[in-house]
Amino acid sequence: MNKGPTVAGQAVYSKKVLSIYDFWVLGVSNNFFWKCPTRNISEQFLMLVTSNHLDVGIGSGYYLKYYLSQSTKRIALLDLNQNSLDATSKAINHFQPEVYCGDVLEPLELNVDRFDSISVNYLLHCLPGNLID
């Protein structure tokens, strides 16, 4: 597989971009482009997240930072972008997250217990190809 497009899709998430990510994505993009307010996504996240959760394509980690129950037993992060992993793992350090750097389009050889819930918020638009592919 050509890794170039996958790497390009995540490369935009620099520390500088992550500093305005929540404002742009959650405040502007969700409301005006996708017509799906962040509060709707937050409500769905709250309904579906479990205390044994894997978040894939974590972005800024917004939903993890603000909507994880304090009783969460296990949280794991999977992303190709180290900036996102560093920022989010630091922000939710009190949960002692498992952190995995990897490409979702490549086989992942993680020798870990299963998760009860997995979220992929804002991941699909970063993957190479188009809807027909």
Language model region names:
Residues 108-118:
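A short acidic, Gly/Pro-enriched loop at the edge of an enzyme's catalytic core
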Residues 1-48, 62:
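Conserved class I S-adenosyl-L-methionine
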Residues 127-133:
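A short, conserved alpha-helix within the catalytic core of class I
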Residues 52-107:
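Class I SAM-dependent methyltransferase SAM/SAH-binding core
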Residues 121-125:
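Residues lining the SAM
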